[in-house]
């Protein structure tokens, strides 16, 4: 069903770890409006879609969201790699995450609340599901906030 290419859609190269920024970006991975929820939403809703074209589109979008999830995971990983104890102690935003997950990439919101399927919906009603998709995509705009409000002087990645 899926073909996996062993490369990211866009390269992620972050030279300097930044655990404070990682504490914000992690919401794009497993927060209520993050990529994990988006991919599960689309891939679940496709089964009850009565039109082949819409079913195919939901499959394509859900698969694309999995790719986005992988890029966010790479960003979080690179922002937290090789942290010293001092780095963690000096970043109160990242310290609670570190207690439970060290530098593992775990699907959670910046608040620390773990990802849950309770933040997505698949009703079986095509109109309700597509309406929910539109609302969720609007909410995903929040994910640009950490990127737009932070400078990445030692990094290169495209956020599209």
Spans of features found by a protein language model:
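Non-heme di-metal
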Residues: 1-160
